[in-house]
UniProtKB/Swiss-Prot annotation:
SMART domains: AAA (SM00382), CDC48_2 (SM01072), CDC48_N (SM01073)
Keyword hit for Aminoacyl-tRNA synthetase: no
Modified residues (Phosphoserine): 3, 7, 13, 37, 462, 702, 770, 775, 787
Region (Interaction with UBXN6) location: 797-806
Enzyme category, top tier: hydrolase
Compartments it resides in: Cytoplasm, Cytosol; Endoplasmic reticulum; Nucleus; Cytoplasm, Stress granule
Protein name per Swiss-Prot or TrEMBL: Transitional endoplasmic reticulum ATPase
Native source organism of the sequence: Sus scrofa
Signal peptide: none
UniProt subunit comment: Homohexamer. Forms a ring-shaped particle of 12.5 nm diameter, that displays 6-fold radial symmetry. Part of a ternary complex containing STX5A, NSFL1C and VCP. NSFL1C forms a homotrimer that binds to one end of a VCP homohexamer. The complex binds to membranes enriched in phosphatidylethanolamine-containing lipids and promotes Golgi membrane fusion. Binds to a heterodimer of NPLOC4 and UFD1, binding to this heterodimer inhibits Golgi-membrane fusion. Interaction with VCIP135 leads to dissociation of the complex via ATP hydrolysis by VCP.
Length: 806
């Protein structure tokens, strides 16, 4: 039942975004008739709207744009569509497939005079009289309706010229009759000024926050457009909206879009600009802004960076800030009832704003504009790429899935980076010195998926800029052996990120974390890196000792910050290396500054529990002293799975050697299996060291032989004409034999016994290996070895002391 209610509530919250179906709402379609003043409808639709052929109609498009046209009937047009050509579409700021409304406009007067100006780049190099060649034939006997602000295109004399209607009398629209005076004197209009008004932001240019847009629309547009609604129901319309969220999510953009779409007077106050050095002037600046807005109501006042002018009063030492906050409070209370002034503010630090501002009646609605999810990111990418030339192989959905934690600004940067990369590929054809670039080159430019791939590798989300989150370049192939551990990790991290639907189906929240423990040099850190790389999650690595600082309370704040960042960039893997340095058992360590270490542990414990389940944040801890870690961290729900990473057995050692030597040329007669057999008890790091040393020896030999050959060439130039082979083409057996002389085991048997004991005690405390349900359902056999049983049974079952590395 609850889910039904939820879905209903969901529908209501975005109800304002739905287009209402009315007979005069029509879908824009491409025109057959190329005339700029004509739109065509189907005959049944014209009858329904009571229009006749040749009537003047008023069309309303996006961003409050209007146009007047003559309507004709067209039998090929379907009932719900309206055909209009590109000029009309541009004047209405609509694209094909958008919805516009149409209404009859019977009282259009004949114009006394109109003033049109050409747009500069379309009249370059044209000689002769513009009026005679273009305007006169265009308007002759046509009785065209025009509206102030329209741009129309006239073809004639081999060229097409665009004109803009600057003024009409009577305003704002009229019909150009034969006796209308047409002025076309004056400077041509610059294209740039036109483009700017074309690039106004509308709701279509905002992706990834549908719900928030709906909230803002009902808070801003309803009171401004239909104040009677609120009067009828007897409540005061809301006064203020506070938009908050991480930087780059589009707070200022939303405010701009609202201003453009509502057509309200928009007054922008940038926080820091109000401040003035003269006493009392900062407040009067604020007062002036509010007075100005009230004069021009309906109006929207937008305060950007609110935290700059309204910080908490008890925290600030400056007298000016306090007075400004008080002034803002009184102004917002004293906005005359229904003065149709709405105050919007944006900040990315909502908690540093004076609490008096956040009560009802001032900023009563706080809209959290968060980091977009995958569908939101797809919307944003589509908006940014709608003017880009994309190759056919570009899969924006995949790009959206791979950009976890990116906000709108990051995605915009990603698109421009990809486009730049596409240009770089053609750089050999482009000459900077040339005046123009070949049209061929221009037309061949297209952004491919590879360009996006490259841009993806370059960009990281802005939420994580200071903790540089690199997805490591380590794959499963770099890790030899440890098959069971890899499986376990995939279950833990990859599945919740890649198949969240399965977890919903079985009603399970994914587990939060794992602890790797085992002797040093067995690849604990490497595993964590590989898992972050495999599932394309963000990866924050935290070195234990770095969290502790000398200042009181700072260490805990560091922990909080790290967890906040991880939540913002979810899915994210938090990797605590050397966990034992910050999570020692509490109470034992006397003498550290006021129990700082204990407080850090407490902070970590609360953060792990309080990690909201919606976010995919995983914690991986690694330690080689599991015995001194606080037991509270090891309980299920925090680090539920304890995975013992043993010394590699023979098979794993072969795999490690192979993984290490993947990129090196090795002689055929080097028997890695024999090498693995001989290195019993060596950890992964020790084996890597052997390989490195063998490589070093080969490199040294190669360099020395080159020097020797160079000397011989100098002493006897004639004899050395013959080009010799490379003296050391690959790593030979003797290099490995030499390297083995220096090889040593870094982990003693004693250490291993300690780990074995720890693993064994864990095993005993959860040893329900023989658990079976009573015989009714023979099928359900219990898990082979307690729920989190480490890496296969082999490690624990062998009792003989000789073979500790099974």
């Amino acid at each position: 039942m609850a889910s039904g209610a939820d879905s209903k509530g969901d529908d209501l919250s975005t109800a304002i975004l739905k287009q209402k179906n009315r007979p005069n709402r029509l879908i824009v379609d491409e025109a057959i008739n190329e005339d700029n003043s004509v739109v065509s409808l189907s005959q049944p639709k014209m009858d329904e709207l009571q229009l006749f052929r040749g009537d003047t109609v008023l069309l309303k498009g996006k961003k409050r744009r209007e146009a007047v046209c003559i309507v004709l009937s067209d039998d090929t047009c379907s009932d719900e569509k309206i055909r209009m050509n590109r000029v009309v579409r541009n004047n209405l700021r609509v694209h094909l497939g958008d919805v516009i409304s149409i209404q009859p406009c019977p009282d259009v007067k004949y114009g006394k005079r109109i003033h049109v100006l050409p747009i500069d780049d379309t009249v370059e190099g044209i000689t002769g009289n513009l009026f005679e060649v273009y305007l006169k034939p265009y308007f002759l006997e046509a009785y065209r309706p025009i509206r102030k602000g329209d741009i129309f295109l006239v073809r004639g004399g081999m060229r097409a010229v665009e004109f803009k209607v600057v003024e009409t009398d009577p305003s704002p629209y009229c019909i150009v009759a034969p006796d209308t005076v047409i002025h076309c004197e004056g400077e041509p209009i610059k294209r740039e000024d036109e483009e700017e008004s074309l690039n106004e932001v509308g709701y279509d240019d905002i992706g990834g926050c549908r719900k928030q847009l709906a909230q803002i629309k009902e808070m801003v547009e309803l009171p401004l457009r239909h104040p009677a609604l609120f009067k009828a129901i007897g409540v005061k319309p809301p006064r203020g909206i506070l938009l908050y969220g991480p930087p780059g999510t589009g707070k200022t953009l939303i405010a701009r879009a609202v201003a453009n779409e509502t057509g309200a007077f928009f007054f922008l106050i940038n926080g820091p600009e109000i401040m003035s050095k003269l006493a009392g002037e900062s407040e009067s600046n604020l007062r002036k802004a509010f007075e100005e807005a009230e004069k021009n109501a309906p109006a929207i006042i937008f305060i950007d960076e609110l935290d700059a002018i309204a910080p908490k009063r008890e925290k600030t030492h400056g007298e000016v800030e306090r007075r400004i906050v008080s002034q803002l409070l009184t102004l917002m209370d004293g906005l005359k009832q229904r003065a149709h002034v709405i105050v919007m503010a944006a900040t990315n630090r909502p908690n540093s704003i004076d609490p008096a501002l956040r009560r009802f009646g001032r900023f009563d609605r706080e809209v959290d504009i968060g980091i977009p999810d995958a569908t939101g990111r797809l919307e944003i990418l589509q908006i940014h790429t709608k003017n880009m030339k994309l190759a056919d192989d570009v899969d924006l959905e995949q790009v959206a899935n791979e950009t976890h934690g990116h906000v709108g600004a990051d995605l915009a940067a990603l698109c421009s980076e990809a486009a730049l990369q596409a240009i770089r590929k053609k750089m050999d054809l482009i000459d900077l010195e040339d005046e123009t670039i070949d049209a061929e080159v221009m037309n061949s430019l297209a952004v491919t998926m590879d360009d996006f791939r490259w841009a993806l590798s370059q960009s990281n989300p802005s939420a994580l800029r200071e903790t540089v989150v690199e997805v490591p370049q380590v794959t499963w192939e770099d890790i030899g052996g440890l098959e069971d551990v890899k499986r376990e990790l995939q279950d833990l991290v990859q599945y919740p990120v890649e198949h969240p639907d399965k977890f919903l189906k079985f009603g399970m929240t994914p587990s939060k974390g794992v602890l790797f423990y085992g002797p040093p040099g067995c690849g604990k850190t490497l595993l964590a890196k590989a898992i972050a790389n495999e599932c394309q999650a963000n990866f924050i690595s935290i070195k234990g000792p770095e969290l502790l600082t000398m200042w009181f309370g700072e260490s805990e704040a560091n922990v909080r910050e790290i967890f906040d960042k991880a939540r913002q960039a979810a899915p994210c893997v938090l990797f605590f290396d050397e966990l034992d340095s910050i999570a020692k058992a509490r109470g034992g360590n006397i003498g550290d500054g006021g129990g700082a270490a204990d407080r850090v542990i407490n902070q970590i414990l609360t953060e792990m529990d309080g990690m909201s389940t919606k976010k995919n944040v995983f914690i991986i801890g690694a330690t080689n002293r599991p015995d001194i870690i606080d037991p509270a961290i090891l309980r299920p729900g925090r680090l539920d799975q304890l995975i013992y990473i043993p010394l590699p057995d023979e098979k794993s050692r072969v795999a490690i050697l192979k993984a290490n030597l993947r990129k090196s040329p090795v002689a055929k007669d080097v028997d890695l299996e024999f090498l693995a057999k001989m290195t019993n008890g060596f950890s992964g790091a020790d084996l890597t060291e052997i390989c490195q040393r063998a490589c070093k020896l080969a490199i040294r030999e190669s360099i020395e032989s080159e020097i020797r050959r160079e000397r011989e060439r100098q002493t006897n130039p004639s004899a050395m004409e013959v080009e010799e082979d490379d003296p050391v083409p690959e790593i030979r057996r003797d290099h490995f034999e030499e390297a083995m002389r220096f090889a040593r085991r870094s982990v003693s048997d004693n250490d291993i016994r300690k780990y074995e004991m720890f693993a064994q005690t864990l095993q005993q405390s959860r040893g329900f290996g023989s658990f079976r349900f009573p015989s009714g359902n023979q099928g359900g056999a219990g898990p082979s070895q307690g729920s989190g049983g480490g890496t296969g049974g082999s490690v624990y079952t062998e009792d003989n002391d000789d073979d500790l590395y099974g």
